[in-house]
Amino acid sequence: MGYNTNWIDEILRTGVSHVHNLMFKGGTAKTNYVVNMNYRNLQGIFHKSDKEEFQGRAEVNHSMFDDKLNIKLQLLANKTGYTSTTDGGSYDTYSWRQAMIHNPTEPIKNADGTWYENTGIFNYDNPMARIYESDGQQDLQQIRISGNVAYRPIKDLTLNALLSYDRISQTGGYYETKHHISTVRDGRNGYASTGSANNMTKLIELTAQYHKTFDGHTVQALAGYSYQQMNYNRQYEQNYDFPTDLFSWHNIGVGQALKKGLATEYSYWLDTNLIGFFGRINYNYRDRYLLMAALRHEAASQLEGTHQPWGNFPSVSVGWRVTNEPFMRNQKVFDDLKLRAGYGVTGSQPSDSFLGKSLLGYGDYYLYNGKWIRALQPTQNSNSSLKWEEKHEVDVGVDFSILDYRINGTIDYYYRLIKGLLYDYSVPSPPNLYTTTRANVGEMSNRGIEVMINAIPVKTHDLTWSSTITFSTNTNKLKSLSNDLYKTSSDYFMTGWIEEPVKTESHIVRIGHRVGDIYGFKVVGVDDNGKWIYLNHEGKEVNYDDFTHAFEDKQILGNGVPKWYLGFNNQVKYKNWDLAVNMRGAFGFQIINGVRMFYENRSRQDWNRLRSAYDKVFGKAVLNTLCSEEFNSYYVEDGDYWKIDNITLGYNFKKIGKYIKALRLYATVNNAITITGYKGIDPEVTTAGLNPGYDNRDIYPHTRSFTFGTVVTF
């Protein structure tokens, strides 16, 4: 068409943000206060991606009766608002995809000023029209109030009462105009949605703590009770087919779709409770031998109707500060050396409620005796054997310091065994009411090492350089998903999803293996015509035309969980100057490059493609246009990276004039440099969950920001 449209540049901008902080404090010997206020006005890199936030914090402390009674009051108030270009979210990431695939020879608008849309191509929208013909706003308000009263009736006993109330309320609305693609292509004739959500948490915690020191012995004992009540409610409605765009989402009832039963509305309400009794004992002998033992006894309303709504979670740890032993007094190596070990159990209640009971739900409408009615049907089997998920952890470690405390650090080894993982098991119906039953019989283990080293390599009168190195590694394994009663039909299940047009699972979870295994077809080359050559499950090479893409030919192509992480933080101070450089990296993992998978493929002639789509695959031939988009090993890459996360340079002025006690000027670069062999935009992708390591093509890219600021102390 003769145009030269850079669609990426059109939807992006340089975001300019400003942040303001104000803190003041004061008081007397008996009463003091601190007030913090923060205002943030943030522009995203996409058009119509704006956020405004105000937050205030206040804390007041007061003591009386010779410091026997101490009262603390805390208040947090937060108000956040952000624009929305997608229903129920913030930014429409689908517009990013459309900018990537859009033909640069097409215009943004027609000659008459209307948006140019090529509706003859499937899933091909004008990204600028998607952004500017949608309008939404999300507003969030939070209020948190807490009060703490501590009373010391006798010298060694402290009674404490904590009360808190936390409420988060969110309201939002969204509208797509009659010029949006949803009308142009789908005929919705204007679309609106509104919704609200409220989260409320109330907490009361009562404790009594006893502290006694005698003849080198120190004993601390704590006993307590806690009760937490949580409420969550939400309502949502949508409508379309509006007479005008003037109302936006503010008059949602005038749309015709809801009246015709074609739109959606629903509401939701959930109450949960958590009650607990707990105790802890700490023992210390001359700061040499340390012991801690604790027990929590908790019940959760999510387990109502089961035989085990209560759980017991013990923990114990021991420590030996070797450097305080008499035989270590004359040694010159360690300034401090402490050996420690611990074992503990923590519990996690299910996120869903009523899991122990049979549930019924409303099905579809059907005609009965001349009337449309909805039938009740089973939606969940009861399972009175459900219980808390438990994490059993063993930890051994050492803390040390050498060279007159110039180098200190910690080294830890841990082993975690999670028992009672929830999983949905297929069961016969009848005799069961429903075809699946949820039970917690799975087991998963994690083991790893965590190291942190702090050092001061240089320390003179004017110059100080301090560094922190962190290292961690973790290996997990799914140990079991079955017991004598509940068994899986196979030793694996598929998870993850690669969206249309590929539409296939991306990961496999297998008993006895790591979580995060990437599972797909392995290619070893292309033929002279640019068609894939596969390696089947027998290890034989198969040409594209003869390959059946059978499930049994899929193989493990990598793992999306890094084997180890490394961090290196540095701070240099020279007179009034200071420089901080923070770096980190992840290593030993693979990434599915979704951008290359879709945009290096030449089978879709109506999409824009990456220039690399015309590179020779495996250095032999350009990929044949008959090879449609698919997920295979060619698009799985090593994800190792090293990032210079943050660089901050600052200068500190001493007292200026009569009123300014201190002044600091600084400049910061975030997400400064990334060193990687990965071909995608950013190797830092999601590494959590069951399908880690997928670089989705519809994702808000990480940004690089430059900040200039000042801190004034009066």
Give residue spans per PLM region.
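C-terminal structured "cap/appendage" subdomains that terminate the fold
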Residues: 643-675
